[in-house]
């Protein structure tokens, strides 16, 4: 069968139209946004259900948080945990449960970085996640760096030397001499802005980071957990008006207090932390926060804290 010259030219014209249409189509959006991270804190997951049967709701609440994170479009490139993964004593069973509940995030290609809180124990944590013993930036502590396009996150380890045994817990935080010296050298050598992170507030107990962070040109702010409620504040040394150092506290994913997580989005000149709060309750679990729950969630959800990077 012979093709006429007219048919041949018509085919070329149609093909050119298809190619032109494809050229004008927007490129597919990446599944993960490298400028977006999610911050979670104070999970308090209970792997010993028979021993603490009244605290099973933390697992359900954390699964709800994971579902909301997985519904973000695009997905965050990073999820950063600010500690208190364990319910109370850093039991191995708590970390086994946590690893199971983290898996959907990992399966979705999200990088997970874990920090420790006062209810965690390094030895049992490292049994479940042994890679942190090699990757830590400060031997003997669990210290990590998360690199984002416009800022680096430094996750510090502020848990103290509390014994592993039950009923010998301690809420205060501390920063070891070695970690403090490492942080001072790292901030001095930094070539891009830094946000420091920890479970405890930087000026709380023996953490003692106020002067170091306030005096650093690279450090632009600090984010922490522990208090189970969202708030924004600032650090200052004396009454020096030259630098306001913003800090922000994260909610719990489901133990008590403000319930939710925060998204952290970076831009060339700033980074914005945004609260995603969808519940509030006390230690009785979901439903224990009435009649204040609706008012608190409505007032707080969507609040932001801005860190200026330049």
Predicted ranges, named:
Residues 43-46, 85-88, 118-122, 159-162, ...:
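Solvent-exposed loop/turn segments at secondary-structure junctions
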Residues 25-93, 185:
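N-terminal active-site segment of His-dependent metallophosphoesterases
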Residues 1-16:
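N-terminal secretory signal peptides and thylakoid transit peptides that target proteins
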Residues 21-23:
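Boundary at the C-terminal end of the N-terminal hydrophobic targeting segment
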Residues 29, 91-182, 208-221, 232-250, ...:
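Extended active-site neighborhood of metal-dependent phosphoesterases/phosphodiesterases
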Residues 40-41, 79-83, 111-117, 195-199, ...:
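Active-site neighborhood of phospho(di)ester-bond hydrolases with catalytic His/Asp-centered motifs
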Residues 185-202:
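Short acidic, glycine-rich surface-loop motifs adjacent to enzyme active sites
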Residues 270-310:
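Acidic, His/Gly-rich catalytic cores of divalent-metal-dependent hydrolytic chemistry
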